[in-house]
């Protein structure tokens, strides 16, 4: 009966170690930046790994007062591109911890 307790303690120790690794990797991921761009780099946006926008750059050629819709579309494209990169890196980094849990 005591033998089972040793295994349980070992398993708990491994779980705590894994949790610490996950926390450290998530923190490192949150510090990374990801830049997304619209076609021809007309709009670029930069996000952190925790999906906070840090910067937006709009090429002056993208600003046409007669075609605001185009600029809006470019911003959306750049934001979506950056967020896709964040999601892909998050899955790559953190996916090993959730593999088989879904």
Swiss-Prot record:
The keyword Heme does not apply. SUPFAM superfamilies: YbaB-like. Homodimer. It comes from Lactiplantibacillus plantarum (strain ATCC BAA-793 / NCIMB 8826 / WCFS1). One of its GO terms (molecular function) is DNA binding. It is found in: Cytoplasm, Nucleoid. The lineage of its organism: Bacteria, Bacillati, Bacillota, Bacilli, Lactobacillales. GO terms for cellular component: bacterial nucleoid; cytosol. Binds to DNA and alters its conformation. May be involved in regulation of gene expression, nucleoid organization and DNA protection. This is Nucleoid-associated protein lp_0699.
């Amino acid at each position: 009966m005591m033998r089972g307790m040793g295994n349980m303690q070992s398993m708990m120790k491994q779980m705590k170690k894994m949790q610490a690794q996950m926390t450290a990797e998530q923190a490192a991921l949150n510090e990374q930046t990801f830049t997304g761009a619209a076609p021809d780099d007309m709009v670029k946006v930069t996000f952190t790994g925790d999906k906070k926008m840090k910067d937006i750059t709009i090429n002056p050629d993208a600003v046409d007062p007669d075609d605001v819709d185009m600029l809006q579309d470019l911003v959306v494209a750049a934001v979506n591109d950056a967020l896709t990169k964040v999601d892909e890196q998050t899955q790559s980094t953190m996916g090993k911890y959730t593999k088989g849990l879904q």
